[in-house]
Amino acid sequence: MKYKRIVFKVGTSSITHSDGSLSRGKIQTITRQLAALHHAGHELVLVSSGAVAAGFGALGFKKRPVKIADKQASAAVGQGLLMEEYTANLSSDGIVSAQILLSRADFADKRRYQNAGGALSVLLQRRAVPIINENDTVSVEELKIGDNDTLSAQVAAMIQADLLVLLTDIDGLYTGNPNSNPDAVRLDKIEHINHEIIEMAGGSGSANGTGGMLTKIKAATIATESGVPVYICSSLKPDALAEAADNQADGSFFVPRAKGLRTQKQWLAFYSESRGGVYVDEGAEHALSEQGKSLLMSGIAGIEGHFSRMDTVTVYSKATKQPLGKGRVLFGSAAAEDLLKLRKAKGVFIHRDDWISITPEIRLLLTEF
């Protein structure tokens, strides 16, 4: 079995009718495939959108609401209805499902991040199928993960999945928008995600969901940097899930980084919030970027912001002002500044185990999305 632990993500358009309402037939198609894979021995996680779509009709809205409060109320009703559909279908095949609602704060806080990963691991060990969505009812708009493509990649990285499959209404990444450009060609295999790939993704999207092709490229970047391969393929094919699990999907395949980031490094790179900045001299820059060493106090050339011990900070080159990476500090900003002034700056400021260098792909995540 090439891919045992698989995360599938289905978007709103993959489980709804053209009017935006929930399609029980489409959900049954997905759960039928999940059940077959589960019984074949795969460990499965489903990240599913559709809570708003499932709930807005029950609240008397004629169409999908636009106002934030209306969407959150619809999600509150719809999440239960959505889970009811998934649970009924999976339980008829003898499969236990579990609901997990996550938010950006669950990833930003290291302890909550570890707890979520632990719960998911137990569910998979006990042969349950976790069904995950963002907690839309209570999430603050400015602090949301924002789309389930990104959420699915974060989950896949967290549990060290063998494969992430992003199911959509477009069968992969094209050189242009296939709906409007007859000359657009699908890319079947993507070795590296760069500016050109991001430009290609800018024109594709769907009317009902919030995650267009650009968010799928962001998700693919997070996953592949974490060592997880990614398929983007159409949910419209009756055996799309099985084909992806068998490495035969009709879509775009993203090749993972040869040595994926460990969980601690993932958290530093993608989720930890930087509380300040540190500028380092040329020697420290070389030690961090080229030799994989810890950052010593003696290499610090400047500090900005206010941060505490074990906070995450961004480290910059004094010469170029470009970010070199992120790390958790062993001294707060006040203590570090005092030591620097007294010329008693000795010891380790950021240990190499709590450091992540910014690769070109991670830089794209920080600057392009």
UniProtKB/Swiss-Prot annotation:
Substrate binds at S49, D136, N148. Its EC number is 2.7.2.11. GO terms for cellular component: cytosol. Pfam families: AA_kinase (PF00696), PUA (PF01472). Its main location: cytoplasm. Pathway: Amino-acid biosynthesis; L-proline biosynthesis; L-glutamate 5-semialdehyde from L-glutamate: step 1/2. It comes from the Bacteria. One of its GO terms (molecular function) is RNA binding. The keyword Nucleotide-binding applies. Keywords: Amino-acid biosynthesis, ATP-binding, Cytoplasm, Kinase, Nucleotide-binding, Proline biosynthesis, Transferase. One of its GO terms (biological process) is L-proline biosynthetic process. It is found in: Cytoplasm. It is an enzyme of class 2 (transferase). It catalyses: L-glutamate + ATP = L-glutamyl 5-phosphate + ADP. Residues 275-355 form the PUA domain. ATP binds at K9, T168, D169, T210, G211, G212, M213, L214, T215, K216. Catalyzes the transfer of a phosphate group to glutamate to form L-glutamate 5-phosphate. Belongs to the glutamate 5-kinase family. This is Glutamate 5-kinase. The lineage of its organism: Bacteria, Pseudomonadati, Pseudomonadota, Betaproteobacteria, Neisseriales. The gene is proB.
